[in-house]
């Protein structure tokens, strides 16, 4: 499960600056759900290959009401949701009474907590952070969030328990590296690598289906409708996290695991809207799924929350099916307006199937599974190197790559780089310098050629590194002697 990091601290210590720094490392869309989450912000980030969800909370000021009262709002909930807490303090302002109150609360919680002193740029970090050791939270990590200094090292320290131990790679000498480079270049020119053996059988595993959406769009009704049709007893699988309910079921001789993010089995026990709609629960369910079923209320249209969820789904690379619920009872004119609005606002996800359903009455629900099955099959379909290379060559013939610094980009071969989502890796010369428009052209060409529906497709570009880049030629002893004789001859001529 992808870890969750919460940023807490007094106002104006740089929490939002660090949040933006982290979520922009891969231009992740920030999922912002005002009101429902009490103005907390959620984002997906990656630093040095480590992925995580980060929560930005409002500031906590130690007023006369007490820190505990302020904590009972957004920050306390964020701490409870998080696996890791980054307690941020202002190195320039020094230790404040509110910092001590927050630290006292954090020490009482069984959470991995890291003390982060921000705004250390331009000052001596050792001197500025000395007072914070009295908070009793261990080492103080000095950073400058606005400039990014120390942020990468901080995340590596924080994520250390979640990283698999990696064996260090043996370093090659310059001669070995040069020989390996040219050997690889010759191999690339002469032959296309063979496909590796893959024993993975997607049909042997159940499809993990996450049903997500805003509150009151009909997620629970749809879940009960699906389960009611199959007469499967609902129960909670042990070991599930964040209270998402994992429900095994079988449909058309195919096994599924339904991930119900609504978490509502007995309506009488739900007392707060926040309890019904946990953003973290939803985001982690998306990460854990193979296919995401996004439920939209036809009467409310596409809201900013829907687009935020949609952005997170796309960023996660999960397969997608869209269900427009509460379609029954709408007039033909209203239905036409909804369809026009969907075409306008969802044009960027043209690969996703859209179904118009009524979870309450069951109309259209059965057809959802055809698209779910199609999306899963497309995302896990194995495609050989020869076919991918042939498609790449056809795309190149139809539309030549543009010139880069006066030279034509050369596409050598393509192979599969991963699944769910499908990843195509293209090797060649100067491929990393291709324009964004040509990269989109290649992505759409592969999608059409492979008939991929219901899942995003990603294109990665790789080119061999030139071992001589940035190096100066060194003259041999013989060349040095010739150069010396030439220089002496020129001096005599003067």
From Swiss-Prot:
The keyword Metal-binding does not apply. PROSITE patterns: G_ENGA. GTP 2 binds at residues 213-220, 260-264, 325-328. Disulfide bonds: none annotated. HAMAP family: GTPase_Der. NCBIfam families: GTPase_EngA, small_GTP. This is GTPase Der. The lineage of its organism: Bacteria, Pseudomonadati, Pseudomonadota, Gammaproteobacteria, Enterobacterales.
């Amino acid at each position: 499960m992808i870890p969750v990091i919460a940023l807490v601290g007094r106002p104006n210590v740089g929490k939002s600056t660090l949040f933006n720094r982290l979520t922009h490392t891969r231009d992740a869309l920030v999922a912002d759900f005002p009101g429902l989450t009490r103005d907390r912000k959620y984002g997906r980030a990656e630093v040095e290959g480590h992925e995580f969800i980060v929560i930005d909370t409002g500031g906590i000021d130690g007023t006369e009401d007490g820190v505990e009262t302020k904590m009972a709002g957004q920050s306390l909930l964020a701490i409870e949701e998080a696996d890791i807490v980054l307690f941020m303090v202002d190195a320039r302002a020094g230790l404040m009474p509110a910092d001590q109150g927050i630290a006292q609360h954090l020490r009482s919680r069984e959470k991995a907590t890291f003390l982060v002193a921000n705004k250390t740029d331009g000052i001596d970090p050792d001197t500025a952070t000395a007072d914070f050791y009295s908070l009793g939270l261990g080492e103080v990590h000095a950073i400058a969030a606005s400039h990014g200094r120390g942020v990468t090292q901080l995340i590596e320290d924080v994520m250390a328990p979640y990283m698999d131990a990696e064996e260090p790679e043996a370093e090659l000498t310059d001669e070995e590296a040069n020989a390996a480079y040219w050997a690889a270049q010759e191999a690339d020119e002469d032959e296309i690598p063979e496909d590796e053996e893959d024993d993975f059988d997607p049909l042997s595993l159940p499809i993990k289906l996450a049903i997500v959406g805003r509150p009151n769009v009909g997620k629970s009704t749809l879940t009960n409708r699906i389960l009611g049709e199959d007469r499967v007893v609902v129960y909670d699988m042990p070991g599930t996290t964040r209270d998402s309910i994992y429900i095994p079921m079988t449909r058309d001789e195919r096994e599924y695991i339904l991930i119900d993010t609504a978490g509502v089995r007995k309506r009488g026990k739900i007392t707060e809207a926040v309890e019904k709609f946990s953003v973290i629960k939803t985001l982690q369910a998306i990460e854990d799924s193979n296919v995401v079923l996004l439920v939209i209320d036809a009467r409310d249209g596409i809201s900013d929350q829907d687009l935020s969820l949609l952005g997170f789904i796309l960023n996660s690379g999960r397969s997608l099916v869209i269900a427009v619920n509460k379609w029954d009872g709408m007039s033909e004119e209203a239905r036409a307006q909804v369809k026009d609005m969907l075409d306008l606002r969802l044009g960027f996800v043209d690969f996703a199937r859209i179904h118009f359903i009524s979870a309450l009455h069951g109309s259209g629900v059965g057809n959802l599974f055809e698209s779910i099955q199609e999306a899963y099959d497309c995302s896990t379909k194995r495609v050989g190197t020869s076919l991918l290379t042939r498609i790449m060559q056809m795309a190149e013939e139809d539309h030549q790559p543009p010139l880069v610094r006066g030279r034509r980009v050369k596409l050598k071969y393509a192979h599969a780089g991963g699944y769910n989502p499908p990843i195509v890796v293209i090797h060649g010369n100067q491929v990393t310098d291709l324009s964004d428009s040509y990269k989109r052209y290649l992505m759409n060409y592969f999608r059409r050629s492979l008939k991929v529906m219901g899942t995003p497709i990603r294109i990665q570009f790789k080119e061999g590194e030139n071992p001589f880049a940035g190096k100066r030629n060194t003259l041999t002893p013989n060349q040095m002697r010739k150069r010396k004789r030439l220089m002496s001859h020129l001096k005599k001529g003067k």
